[in-house]
Amino acid sequence: MAVLLETTLGDVVIDLYTEERPRACLNFLKLCKIKYYNYCLIHNVQRDFIIQTGDPTGTGRGGESIFGQLYGDQASFFEAEKVPRIKHKKKGTVSMVNNGSDQHGSQFLITTGENLDYLDGVHTVFGEVTEGMDIIKKINETFVDKDFVPYQDIRINHTVILDDPFDDPPDLLIPDRSPEPTREQLDSGRIGADEEIDDFKGRSAEEVEEIKAEKEAKTQAILLEMVGDLPDADIKPPENVLFVCKLNPVTTDEDLEIIFSRFGPIRSCEVIRDWKTGESLCYAFIEFEKEEDCEKAFFKMDNVLIDDRRIHVDFSQSVAKVKWKGKGGKYTKSDFKEYEKEQDKPPNLVLKDKVKPKQDTKYDLILDEQAEDSKSSHSHTSKKHKKKTHHCSEEKEDEDYMPIKNTNQDIYREMGFGHYEEEESCWEKQKSEKRDRTQNRSRSRSRERDGHYSNSHKSKYQTDLYERERSKKRDRSRSPKKSKDKEKSKYR
């Protein structure tokens, strides 16, 4: 009570449960005997679930029982046997396929999973695979499409009955030998069962590596299309754009455009910068109007010295500037021009970090000096009797401040601020104002000194006059004789 199935991948032996499922086993044995299963496709392979075959049409909707062969279309199907109940517990269980009305025809399935309880009571178990489980495993691992149809044909080439306990029904036509397959049977529209799937046969190692690289690139492109990074997996980068790397951080867009413009008109030249700091990332993209100009620049400019750096030039592999509408959409030349116009428009909003700071915010040192000047002038008015050393200290303070100012000038020059000349004139103006204030202070002090000297000299002169008058009065009050004696003594 066993049958040998010769498949395109190997032989499989099935033992039948003739006592538990006599009608199903009779149907299966007699169909094998009339070579009904020869060249049938395995048309449904669901990994770790089932392998389905037995339909001569290969669609899964055909096939009839042996009783239909004997008694006509009215007997194409027979009732399912449900008693005793046999479960789909192990791999290799063989069952007749239910056509939806608890009836069976010619199709059967082989399980490739364990404990498939949801098949119990639906499909009738009538045998199991005892030999050839390795072949069942190969079939289980074959590649299939979305409908679970194998890409390469797997067929039952021949069936051999090893033991048949049932008598042949009358009028059963048994062929003398296996019939030849028809063209319709072999033409499935897929890879033939006898075809070798070897793309690398007869190719050199270099060609094999190239084919593998192309397949890997194609796979990655499809993956990028799936995640939305590419409009189409078959899209190609533009052939008029150059990629330039190993640039000096000080190299600007204008510098590169001037250097590369000698090869032809340039549409755009962009040095890629960090979005947050604005610093150059040392690579750029240059788009030419003509592909010929791009090729000339590629051959001439590689390894050229620019700003003390040896640059590297290659054709761009980026499609970042390509605009598409929706996933997998195509783009036109007009769409590309519209995209360029949108990129050239100035943004309506400016990031706070990119706004130029006001002029006052860059001169904290000058503002501090002005505050010190106002403070010193206020103290000068309140204390006019300060010594001359105060003026000298102010001059020394100015001399000490000059290096700071020069340092700031160097810093602003390095930062590249264009309005440095205005800031320098502002500095000179403030310096002249301070010099005027210092001169005014010195003049006021000199006037105070002159006034003090004149007042002291005047008071001394008045004191001398007063003493003279007083001495005259004393002389008058004395006797004439004494005065005469005194005068005589003078002339002695």
From Swiss-Prot:
UniProt entry keywords in alphabetical sequence: Isomerase, Isopeptide bond, Nucleus, Phosphoprotein, RNA-binding, Rotamase, Ubl conjugation
Transmembrane segments: none
Domain RRM: start-end pairs: 240-318
PTM annotation (Phosphothreonine): residues: 182
MF (Gene Ontology): peptidyl-prolyl cis-trans isomerase activity; RNA binding
Family membership noted in the UniProt record: Belongs to the cyclophilin-type PPIase family. PPIL4 subfamily.
Record's function text: PPIases accelerate the folding of proteins. It catalyzes the cis-trans isomerization of proline imidic peptide bonds in oligopeptides.
Protein's name in the database: Peptidyl-prolyl cis-trans isomerase-like 4
Gene designation: PPIL4
